[in-house]
């Protein structure tokens, strides 16, 4: 990895750093990120934990941009969480709490393997998902010039999605509510669709993906960030899953679908939502995160299963869902801290899981640029498996008593 990091900075020194207004502001940030990468970009380390390879670091916007690009050069995602003002006074305590939380969640890995019974109706509903319709939805989402959370008008696509969801869900067998969540850390809003549980409404299953995009390319039009793979794909998987679930009965548990704001700037929307959930002692049983599902870099129907900062219990359940219904090939992989919104939930002690389009070393390298568009390198048949994961995650966990073991 050190060789890759040195090569990355040699490349920067030879090409120069072209930075757009989207990427730099006057305000530095204090973030939670991987220790080795914070050091590599020259960040000021406020606290560190070598055993976790994590650091609370003070970074300029230029350094944050370099951090994101460094992660991509290593086959990783952006890899940081922007911390709130009330979290930065005691960075050492923050890291210690995360270490305890991580150990507690991973202790569940000592439990036995989950084996699901096949359900004909669940398979029928999962089979309603359509790769062609998925492509149409990704095309619509990626048609916006950008979905950047710091753009002058960061919410047009958000408001449009709220309108579309209300239209698409007409005829569902269950009641639903679509609302917009306002944030402190960004002007962009998060979209939430809630399906109340029939018998256990206080037990919540969360399914989410980020709805923003960003362009960090060296050249070209910096205002153009179509984000077809990152993350119109995961956003569209959730939409298409809901369309299939319209034919299902009302779930026993409450389902909450999120299209998060500001992930590309440090998990902004999901961090606030997960913190509020913990503060209110919300009984979130499980969290599924879908982020980048279109590029079959490791082969068709080869899916990366992120093992760091995720729940062994939920990975076990997702593996059983896959083996029972989807039949893709799952490959364990790591993506580092903060590679997507599941990290926000994990840090608050909730069980989260995230399948990925490939192993990170063979992920789509066109993301965060104007080249992240629909082209022949993408596979909607491949991505449709992730729509099925969302459908089955909602059905299996939304209609059962499954919950993390307690030790």
Q: What is each model feature region?
A:
Residues 134-142, 190-194, 204-208, 227, ...:
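Structural recognition of the beta-strand scaffold that forms the well-ordered cores
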